């Protein structure tokens, strides 16, 4: 596995014993890679990332609901579901729709970058945790200096990331983000519960002002 990792990735793996990254074989495909240790040895999981971004029609998301969501000028849009439920695929379709239909600057912050979005009607800046910025929170602290209209937060993992995501939505930006939650009610509770009790009333008010949509999906087998 070391043959496909760069020096920084190898250092991170040896220090933390865990690594998430992406890898590309030009002309073949892109891959999401997880490397960890088990029983003192390296274990690797590699998943193929589709090179083609599906449209809403391709994904069976008809009826115009997702198109309307992507036309919202500002606020917070949460895409939630269990691991492997297709959140990344849905978000990629949403970002691609915006990219084709709005003249904006999109900044994505991902760990790792999965779907690559070339500039279409939008300018797209894609930043990867580890390669381009140390953490989600660090990237979000500086994102306003990059003059975005739309921000994609690959995952709201901690309190600081959630807080900055809410603040971005309050300042007139359209913010997309993912969470692990099984339904819309749990999604809202998870956002609130990540904060201490003394701050939760303020977060409820803040969330009430900025939350525009919750998309919760399940993969049917």
Predicted feature locations:
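Short, flexible helix-loop junctions that flank or precede catalytic/ligand sites
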Residues: 1-221
């Amino acid at each position: 596995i070391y043959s496909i990792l760069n020096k920084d990735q190898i250092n991170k793996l040896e220090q933390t014993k865990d690594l998430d990254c992406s890898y590309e074989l030009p002309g073949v495909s892109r891959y999401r890679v997880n490397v960890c240790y088990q029983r003192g040895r390296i274990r690797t999981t590699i998943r193929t990332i589709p090179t083609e971004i599906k449209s809403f029609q391709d994904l069976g998301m008809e009826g115009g609901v997702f198109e309307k969501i992507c036309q919202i000028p500002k606020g917070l849009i949460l895409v939630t579901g269990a691991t492997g439920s297709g959140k990344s695929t849905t978000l990629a379709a949403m970002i691609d729709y915006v990219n084709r239909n709005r003249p904006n600057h999109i900044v994505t912050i991902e760990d790792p970058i999965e779907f690559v979005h070339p500039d279409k009607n939008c300018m797209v800046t894609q930043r990867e945790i580890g390669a381009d910025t140390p953490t989600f929170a660090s990237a979000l602290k500086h994102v306003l200096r990059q003059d975005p209209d739309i921000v994609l937060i690959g995952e709201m993992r901690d309190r600081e990331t959630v807080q900055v995501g809410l603040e971005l939505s309050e300042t007139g930006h359209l913010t997309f983000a993912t969470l692990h939650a099984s339904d819309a009610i749990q999604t809202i509770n998870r956002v609130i519960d990540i904060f201490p009790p003394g701050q939760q009333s303020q977060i409820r008010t803040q969330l009430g002002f900025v939350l525009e949509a919750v998309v919760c999906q399940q993969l049917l087998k």
